[in-house]
Amino acid sequence: MPQLVPFYFLNQLVYGFALVTILLVLFAQYFLPQILRLYVSRLFISKL
């Protein structure tokens, strides 16, 4: 299994951290603000 060969550990760590960083930026910049706006607008509408 290639994931258990020590030569590939650094490659997997680099791609893993890169993927987590990209996902974190995408969620923080694009998806979560839209979800928050939707939640707040629904909250204000329900309080009327």
UniProtKB/Swiss-Prot annotation:
Pfam families reported in the protein's UniProt record: Fun_ATP-synt_8 (PF05933)
Cysteines joined through disulfide linkages: none
Residue stretches spanning the membrane: 13-32
Lipid bilayer topology: Single-pass membrane protein
GO MF assignments: proton-transporting ATP synthase activity, rotational mechanism
One GO cellular component term: proton-transporting ATP synthase complex
Top-level lineage group: Eukaryota
Keywords per UniProt: ATP synthesis, CF(0), Hydrogen ion transport, Ion transport, Membrane, Mitochondrion, Transmembrane, Transmembrane helix, Transport
Subcellular location: Mitochondrion membrane
UniProt subunit comment: F-type ATPases have 2 components, CF(1) - the catalytic core - and CF(0) - the membrane proton channel.
Function: Mitochondrial membrane ATP synthase (F(1)F(0) ATP synthase or Complex V) produces ATP from ADP in the presence of a proton gradient across the membrane which is generated by electron transport complexes of the respiratory chain. F-type ATPases consist of two structural domains, F(1) - containing the extramembraneous catalytic core and F(0) - containing the membrane proton channel, linked together by a central stalk and a peripheral stalk. During catalysis, ATP synthesis in the catalytic domain of F(1) is coupled via a rotary mechanism of the central stalk subunits to proton translocation.
Record family assignment: Belongs to the ATPase protein 8 family.
Protein's name in the database: ATP synthase protein 8
Lineage, uppermost ranks: Eukaryota, Fungi, Dikarya, Ascomycota, Saccharomycotina
